[in-house]
Amino acid sequence: MHHIVQFLQTNGGELLYKTYEHITISLIAVILGVLVAVPLGVVLTRMKKGAGTIIGIVNIIQTLPSLAILAFFIPLLGVGKVPAIVALFFYSVLPILRNTYTGIRGVNKNLLESGKGIGMTPAEQVRLVELPLAAPVIMAGIRTSTIYLIGWATLASFIGGGGLGDYIFIGLNLYQPEYIIGGAVPVTILAIVIDYVLAVAERKLTPAGMQRLKELS
């Protein structure tokens, strides 16, 4: 306990900055993932063939070791935050893409026909009918992706990306448990807090009727 208190006294200010770095690289990667995966998911629902293949390819990328992905970008982008964000972006895509595809495919076809009947264009159907109804499922994918990235972002320090992983790597290299705890505990707290916030957002986006069905089931 004495070592942990000493760690906080010595590194309190830097700990806040490392936490900010960790949140920043994770958040940027998730936002990029949303900007790519949601439109791609919409496009895949319009494809009669090939959607499963594309999702399968993204799934393969997801199974690659995190350190291998990070190392792959070093010759291309060097070291620092940029390659870390790009690598995390690739990991963020699958849950969002899969849930967008599943959510939109699950929209009641009668509602789409009603939209056509009142003169909605395909773009208006996506914007006003499909995305709002699929929003809870999409948000669940964003939530999953974000929690994954909070954990994976600790590896960003491997290529100089910063974040709370710096403390974990220092602790492992120098065998200083207080540094490991100083990095691991804030990451865990971040994951719990962000998961709670996104769970609330997911509930807010779920229509009242669907919420009642979930409660009854």
From Swiss-Prot:
Keyword Transmembrane helix set for record: yes
Source organism, top-level taxon: Bacteria
GO cellular component: plasma membrane
Keywords for the protein's UniProt record, in alphabetical order: Amino-acid transport, Cell membrane, Membrane, Transmembrane, Transmembrane helix, Transport
Pfam families on file: BPD_transp_1
GO biological-process terms attached to the record: amino acid transport; glycine betaine transport; transmembrane transport
Listed InterPro entries: ABC_transp_perm/SBD, MetI-like, MetI-like_sf
Membrane topology: Multi-pass membrane protein
This protein's record includes keyword Signal: no
Entries under PROSITE patterns matching the protein: ABC_TM1
Subcellular location: Cell membrane
Main location per the UniProt record: membrane
Residue ranges annotated for the ABC transmembrane type-1 domain, each copy included: 19-198
Main function: Involved in a high affinity multicomponent binding-protein-dependent transport system for choline; probably responsible for the translocation of the substrate across the membrane.
Family: Belongs to the binding-protein-dependent transport system permease family. CysTW subfamily.
Protein name, UniProt field: Choline transport system permease protein OpuBB
Gene label: opuBB
